[in-house]
Swiss-Prot record:
Protein name: Phenylalanine--tRNA ligase beta subunit
Keyword tags: Aminoacyl-tRNA synthetase, ATP-binding, Cytoplasm, Ligase, Magnesium, Metal-binding, Nucleotide-binding, Protein biosynthesis, RNA-binding, tRNA-binding
Lineage: Bacteria, Pseudomonadati, Pseudomonadota, Alphaproteobacteria, Rickettsiales
Cofactor note: Binds 2 magnesium ions per tetramer.
Summary of subunit composition and partner proteins: Tetramer of two alpha and two beta subunits.
């Protein structure tokens, strides 16, 4: 957003310097990107040549008497086109040429003193190629005036929520709220109509508002110098007085407008949706193919504009235009954004409409522009015609001013809070001492909650005044806990991955998450249109990508948030194994991962938090993405701690995975709430001993029961792991062989072989008694 200092001062009463103003702009969030200070161009003056005589000592030079508006100067000039009575540009003494950085000084040229220089266009960097002769100005230029607009130009970066600051008046309002100056009161003219508008308006797209004034008998012409200078200084091309006035109002008040040549409009103007395949010729000389999602402004025969984006060539205002229809409208920001992207058109108008313009300034902007047109071009006006409904939200926010200091970490008095909000245009009803009812102004649709008001006050009060506050200690504790959990998983052979927090709705539904999905209103990609309800689909995609690159043995995990339909996130640990597991010994190097690996990983994570897994029950997994017969849910009294199991073949098919994959999920936020006893830490100083058992049991025996029986058989047992489940030769069809590794250790002495044998016999007896099984091997 560019504007000149003098333009700003039309709306802001202040004695602040340029540097003070730009510093304050950056401090309140309107970051200054550039300041173009043209003060070095003040020495270039409009001058008139009064007399031209030959140089006494040079045939190709001339001696000129030049009037600069204050005195008569003697100038030596070599231009062929210099003549008496012409107006040109004088580089006065002390000025520096922009093209060469040459400073003008009193100089004797062939023995005659020259008190300045008459300039060509190339010497002033107005053209790239070298020009012949000096600049010849029209009679409109006044002798003594500065040739260049030397007004400093300020360029600020406006955030998307501040559409009001895409107008200079909005910027002035923010500056006034800081105390740097006073916002000048805006006087809105009241026009008297003398004719009826032959053009009526209508809205059928269901989302727009349009108003307009018919102005007859205008004399469109070149804009006056002050208006041209204003627009050209910020990079806008002057076109004609009528068009320039609409641009002037847009830059001043963030109020886009459009002027139609009224004689080129047939019937009424209707804001409607385009038909698929309709064509439109824009003012930029390009033709566009439209569709039914784009709002247009059309007459009976032609489309005269794409709503809020660009006008049509068919009703363009020219210097021959005598009657105009001046439009001021409001269009839906989302609709404008989508249409602009579809068509690949970005204009000053669409940029503002997409960020929302003030709906309540629609008529005020129309009157201001119409009054300027009457002043500069003459004419007579109709009354205002309008159609549609204005989307002017009546937003009120309940606000406790004490929250500014509480959450903003500043010290602002209630009177200061009231003063800042009032200067920003908010109106306050003091309901109680602490609770205010704040009416949000129509130009601030981004302010909807108390936090927005806190931001507004702290922004104007000064972000540099915010006190430093230490972070809560619990943040460090949580981070440290998760870091240690990551170390545990790494020690178990896993690699950590980080995946998107988004996924597609269709993928979630295939995993059984059809309810309570958190839909993203404006996703950057249709494949990422919901917040993920599970990390497992993302891990499977990573697994599939690795398998496609030849990496089939994989163990990956992620710690991160998942989301339900109310946008409540909870942290989980999810992991996946596929392919070969780490070999148990050098005789068994190609063991495939199985459900017990996933169970062991899940239990290891729970035991990391000192959960006594002996008290957890194992039930059938309720998640649809697990194999129903090879999975489980770890819980205690309906409080889920985690899930584990082999991934369902149908799920693997979605990712084109042809090998077995197992996974687990630990609900980290449930762990601290699990009503289970905590394991007491025992420092085992003495050597542990392992023994392996293999039992033949019926296939319907739950493996978890065998583990629980073994763990309860002795206090010397520290770990029980399953490392093999076998069906096949030498085993009856309804039987299976379960192989387990049991670790013994005493906290007070090294175990003897006799003690180990006694504990092992107790294990065999209890397992056979509780399962009806038999011992197959022991070693």
């Amino acid at each position: 957003m560019k504007f000149t200092l003098s333009w700003l001062l039309e709306y802001l009463e202040t004695n602040a310097s340029l540097e003070e103003i730009t510093d304050k702009l950056t401090h309140i969030g309107l970051e200054v990107e550039d300041v173009i200070d043209n003060s070095r161009l003040t020495g270039f003056i409009v001058a008139e040549v009064l007399e031209v005589v030959p140089h006494p000592n040079a045939d190709k030079l001339k001696l000129c008497k030049v009037d600069d508006g204050s005195k008569i100067l003697q100038i030596v000039c070599g231009a062929n086109n210099v003549r008496e009575g012409m107006k040109t540009v004088l580089a006065s003494l002390g000025s520096t040429l922009p093209e060469s950085d040459f400073t003008i000084k009193p100089t004797k040229i062939r023995g005659v003193l020259s008190e300045g220089m008459l300039c060509s266009a190339s010497e002033l960097a107005l053209v790239q190629e070298e020009s012949e002769g000096i600049i010849e100005l029209s009679d409109d230029y006044k002798v003594g005036d500065k040739f260049f607009n030397c007004d400093p130009v300020i360029d600020i970066n406006v955030t998307p929520n501040r559409g009001d600051c895409l107008g200079i008046y909005g910027i002035a309002r923010d500056l006034a709220a800081t105390g740097i100056g006073t916002l000048k009161t805006l006087s809105i003219p009241q026009l008297t109509s003398s004719i009826n508008s032959p053009i009526d308006v209508e809205v059928t797209d269901g989302e727009s508002f349009i108003s307009g004034i018919y102005i007859a008998n205008v004399k469109n012409q070149e804009s006056p110098k002050w208006l041209k200078d204003r627009l050209e200084s910020i990079g806008m091309r002057s076109i004609s007085a009528i068009v320039d006035i609409t641009n002037y109002i847009m830059i001043s008040f963030s109020r886009p407008m459009h002027a139609y040549d009224a004689k080129k409009i047939e019937g009424e103007l209707t804001v409607r949706k385009a038909n698929d395949g309709e064509k439109f010729a824009g003012l930029n000389g390009k033709e566009y193919l439209l569709n039914k999602d784009i709002s247009v402004i059309a007459g009976d025969k032609n489309i005269h504009g794409i709503a809020g984006i660009i006008g049509g060539k068919c009703s363009e205002c020219t210097l021959e235009t005598t009657d105009i229809f001046l439009e001021s409208a409001w269009f839906d920001p989302i609709s404008i954004t989508k249409s602009s992207r579809q068509l690949g058109i970005s204009t000053d108008a669409s940029y503002r409409f997409a960020r929302s313009v003030d709906p309540e300034f629609t008529f005020d902007g129309l009157n201001l522009a119409a009054k300027m047109i009457l002043d500069l071009c003459g004419g007579e006006t109709s009354s205002v015609v309008s159609a549609g409904s204005l989307d002017s939200a009546d937003t009120k926010v309940s606000f406790d001013y004490q929250d500014v200091n509480k959450f903003g970490s500043v010290s602002v008095s209630p009177d200061e809070v009231l003063d800042i909000l009032t200067k920003l245009g908010f109106s306050i009803d003091k309901k109680t001492e602490g609770n205010w009812n704040v009416q949000v102004p129509s130009w601030r649709p981004d302010v909807t909650i108390p936090a927005d008001l806190i931001e507004e006050v702290t922004r104007i009060y000064g972000y540099d005044k915010i006190k430093e506050e230490p972070l809560p200690n619990n943040v460090e504790e949580v981070d440290s806990t998760y870091d240690n959990l990551r170390i545990l998983m790494t020690n178990r052979g896993f690699h950590e991955v980080l995946t998107w927090s988004f996924m597609s709705e269709s993928t979630a539904e295939k995993f059984g998450y059809s309810n309570k999905l958190f839909i993203i209103d404006n996703p950057f990609n249709n494949s990422f249109n919901i917040m993920r309800p599970s990390i497992m689909p993302n891990l499977l995609q990573v697994t599939a990508d690795n398998i496609a690159h030849g990496i089939s043995d994989l163990a990956i995990f992620e710690i991160g948030p998942i989301y339900d339909g109310e946008a409540q996130s909870k942290y989980v640990l999810s992991g996946i194994r596929s392919g070969n597991n780490l070999p148990r010994n050098h005789y068994n190097t190609d063991r495939k991962v199985d459900v017990f690996d996933a169970k062991a990983d899940c239990i290891a994570a729970l035991e990391f938090f000192n959960v006594n897994c002996d008290n957890l029950t194992i039930e059938k997994a309720e998640k649809e993405h697990y194999h129903p017969g090879k999975s489980g849910t770890l819980s205690f009294k309906n409080k889920v701690a985690g899930y584990f199991g082999e991934l369902h073949p149908n799920i693997l098919d979605l990712f084109d995975i042809k090998q077995k994959v197992v996974g687990f999920e630990v609900i980290l936020e449930n762990i601290e709430n699990l009503p289970v006893s905590r394991k007491k830490f025992i420092d085992y100083k003495y050597q542990s001993v392992k023994r392996d058992f293999a039992f033949i049991v019926n296939k319907d025996v739950e493996v978890g029961n065998i583990i629980n029986v073994i763990k309860k058989s002795s206090e010397l047992i520290t770990e029980v792991l399953i490392f093999d489940v076998y069906h096949g030769n030498n085993i009856e069809p309804n039987k299976m062989s379960i192989a387990l590794s049991v670790t013994f250790c005493s906290p007070i002495h090294t175990l003897t072989e006799k003690e180990i044998q006694k504990e092992s016999s107790a294990i065999v007896n209890l397992v056979c008694e509780n399962t009806g099984g038999t011992l197959r091997t022991y070693r």
